[in-house]
Amino acid sequence: MALGVPISVYLLFNAMTALTEEAAVTVTPPITAQQGNWTVNKTEADNIEGPIALKFSHLCLEDHNSYCINGACAFHHELEKAICRCFTGYTGERCEHLTLTSYAVDSYEKYIAIGIGVGLLLSGFLVIFYCYIRKRCLKLKSPYNVCSGERRPL
């Protein structure tokens, strides 16, 4: 067991070091190049490959502005289609579904079940108490008939 702790500490330290090395990013100032009427900013971040879900998407063109019903429209170049970023409370491909907050109304059935459970529990305790008292009284009874002060005529 003593050997297990240093090994786990060693593994944890190596994992933290690996994460730190992956998270380290050097930032270089952008290079601006004038191309016609367009200004292009190039940085090292443009050359980094990332997951598709995190890639930048541009705002939709005017013909797609009404595509999203309850959200902001963005055009994803790799998917080559308009996607929606829904406002809070809406879901769906075009943010057309309202997310309803659901809650359950307390019904009387729940309270009836709790009442029956408590009643059965109390009844069980009473039966156990009755059996205990009866057994105790039977142990205390003497096998002889002892009168408590009354005398019967012979």
UniProtKB/Swiss-Prot annotation:
Cite the ranges annotated as topological domain Extracellular.
23-110
MF term (GO), any? growth factor activity
SUPFAM superfamilies in alphabetical order: EGF/Laminin (SSF57196)
Specify the glycosylation sites in chain numbering: N37, N41
- Per UniProt, residues of the EGF-like domain are 56-96
Q: RNA-binding as a keyword?
A: no
Q: Which InterPro entries match?
A: EGF-like_dom
Q: Which GO terms describe its cellular component?
A: clathrin-coated endocytic vesicle membrane; extracellular region; extracellular space; plasma membrane
Q: Which domain of life is it from?
A: Eukaryota
Q: Which residues lie on this side of the membrane: Cytoplasmic?
A: 132-154
Q: Where is the signal peptide?
A: 1-22
Question: Which cysteines does the record link by disulfide bonds?
Answer: C60-C73, C68-C84, C86-C95
Provide the GO biological process annotations. Answer: angiogenesis; epidermal growth factor receptor signaling pathway; MAPK cascade; positive regulation of cell population proliferation; positive regulation of epithelial cell proliferation; positive regulation of MAPK cascade; positive regulation of mitotic nuclear division
Q: Where are the membrane-spanning stretches?
A: 111-131
Keywords tagged on the record:
Disulfide bond, EGF-like domain, Glycoprotein, Growth factor, Membrane, Secreted, Signal, Transmembrane, Transmembrane helix
Please explain the role this protein plays, according to its UniProt record: Promotes the growth of epithelial cells. May stimulate the phosphorylation of EGFR and mitogen-activated protein kinases.
The name this protein goes by in its record: Epigen
